[in-house]
């Protein structure tokens, strides 16, 4: 099999000592350990030999049928999604490395959707103000969003339920949008966010609505491990956005942070583009594979 999209011909694999098989069934037939990037389909699960080991980026809390199939076939499964975000596990933290790529690419896609410049321009014909970009979620993807948008010259704001990321956001040149809170409502384990209280959510929605109405581009990255993506942008908020603005929803695979997001599709609502493109890292396959 030739992986042309990643610019690695069969010969590269053969030079590294691999044997090229005719199809997936032949590849899996006598394997003791199977490595796969994307989550397996149930049809692909049928090809995995009983008693083997399987390593992939599948989500055990969402892909229940795949987990059952592993159990029924006595297959030892390793989910790269469950690797903790710690210093010791950093070299194996595929989730963070791929999120970094998604953050970078989402800004470029967002800029392509906009009918305006990203940077401030001062020309003989007049002055063009910078685009206003709002990032919802300042994890690995969100921080890369900020860095990339700033390099393109945009005016960037970022929101996160974890107050401790304020310093990281500001160090990249963005303004941190913060909900007043007496506790650590959104602080979870391993540097991830957790479910917040109803009172916090209400104040959060009010704050986001104010800032989203002024934004040209909104990129959402908020995820909670093992749960559907939190709803941050309601239809009412989208209706309040400027025509020509855009939303890039990086949480589309987990249900989306925007109420109107349709996974794998780009739609337009009330003049606002909502991009639910899935698996952005695969569009930068060379570095996605390298990392």
Language-model segments: residues:
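Conserved small/polar residues in nucleotide/adenosyl-binding loops
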Residues: 1-5
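A structured beta-alpha segment of the ubiquitous adenosine-cofactor-binding alpha/beta core
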Residues: 17-32, 39-40, 186-218, 222-235, ...
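Phosphate/diphosphate ligand-binding glycine-rich loop within oxidoreductases
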Residues: 28-29, 33-111
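Glycine/threonine-rich flexible loop motifs
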Residues: 43-47, 56, 223-233, 258-259
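Rossmann-fold NAD(P)-binding glycine/threonine-rich loop
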Residues: 61-87, 227-279
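Adenosine-phosphate binding glycine-rich loop
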Residues: 81-82, 87-124, 252, 258-291
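Glycine-rich NAD(P)-binding loop of Rossmann-like domains
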Residues: 116-144
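Conserved acidic E/D residue at the C-terminus of a beta-strand in Rossmann-like folds
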Residues: 159-163
